[in-house]
From Swiss-Prot:
This is Cytidine deaminase. HAMAP family: Cyt_deam. Keywords: Hydrolase, Metal-binding, Zinc. The gene is cdd. InterPro entries: APOBEC/CMP_deaminase_Zn-bd, CMP_dCMP_dom, Cyd/dCyd_deaminase_Zn-bd, Cyt/Deoxycyt_deaminase, Cyt_deam_dimer, Cytidine_deaminase-like, Cytidine_deaminase_bacteria. Homodimer. NCBIfam families: cyt_deam_dimer (TIGR01355), PRK09027.1 (NF006537).
Length: 295
């Protein structure tokens, strides 16, 4: 990954490459740009907003983990706070393809796990597939979300997904990224369980009521959280493990460095993530211990 990031930086225009390199290679870079940092990039580059976001896509794509397709896709989400979040696609050799995370899903979940309450726009290398269009239609900002592609005028999500089916069609009025706290608690004193519980409490699961969260502990001691992101169309739902893995990937972590995992989910939900979580962790490393709690 580091080599691909270096290569991407070498492609950047000279007008802002030094400043961008300083940001991206900083030890505390978290694959986001603050509104102020992005404004400085705009000033240095002299580019239009849309052109600069497209120009930065190779940086996002450099984070991709695509051992199956070797097709590296990047995405950049702008949260309603003005901060920009990078994302990339993620695949798992040995796992069924349904465990794949698309770049759009990665960038959106990245923003969500860092506290964003909505997405203003998303910039991607290629036209979003139907799966991702439906995933984005779950968002709090689905009606106003803009999609930017290279060499094209921005369009709204609803232009890409006319006569769309979404949460409202199932009687749900709160979208993905709505601020929630399900208020679940546990006396379990295992740290990773408590961290997974934190993720569970912000999860979006209005259709199955399987509020759930995952926590991953790395060898470095860092812990990454993932909350379940359910979708009105069911299949585009993003499991909590994949959300947690996306957070780790966007911090430059290697999946080989996962030391332990925990899953907490609702005991009364209509589905369970346990079997799929175990299966996906198994293909990453069969020795990863998984703690489990059903509340």
């Amino acid at each position: 990954m580091r080599n691909r990031i270096e290569q991407a930086l070498q492609q950047m225009p000279a007008s802002f490459a030094p400043y961008l390199r300083e940001l991206v290679l900083a030890k505390d870079f978290d694959a986001t740009f603050s509104a102020e940092q992005y404004q400085q990039l705009l000033t240095l580059s002299g580019m239009e907003d849309s052109d600069l976001r497209v120009a930065l896509l190779p940086i996002a794509a450099a984070y991709s983990y695509a051992p199956i397709s070797e097709f590296y896709v990047g995405a950049i989400v702008r949260g309603i706070s003005g901060r920009l979040y990078l994302g990339a696609n993620m695949e798992f050799t040995g796992a069924q393809l349904g465990q794949t995370v698309h770049a759009e899903q990665c960038a959106i979940s990245h923003a969500w796990m860092k506290g964003e309450k909505g997405v203003a726009d998303i910039t991607i290398n290629f036209s979003p597939c139907g799966h991702c269009r439906q995933f984005m239609n779950e968002l709090t900002t689905a009606s106003s979300l803009k999609i930017q592609l290279p060499k094209r005028a921005a369009k709204t999500l609803q232009e890409y997904l006319p006569e769309s089916f979404g949460p409202a069609d199932l009687g749900i009025d709160s979208g993905l990224m709505s601020p929630v706290n399900h208020g679940k608690t546990s006396d379990d004193d295992e740290e990773l369980i408590q961290q997974a519980l934190r993720a569970m409490n912000i999860s979006h699961s209005p259709y199955t009521q399987n509020f759930s969260g995952v926590a991953l502990k790395m060898r470095s001691g860092a812990i990454y959280l993932g909350a379940y992101a359910e979708n009105a169309a069911f299949n585009p739902s993003l499991p909590p493990l994949q959300v947690a893995l996306a957070q780790a990937m966007m911090m430059g972590e290697s999946f080989e460095d996962i030391e332990a995992a925990a899953l907490v989910e609702s005991a009364t939900g209509k589905i369970s993530h346990l079997a799929d979580t175990q299966a996906t962790l198994e293909v990453i490393n069969p020795d990863i211990p998984l703690s489990y709690l059903s509340l």
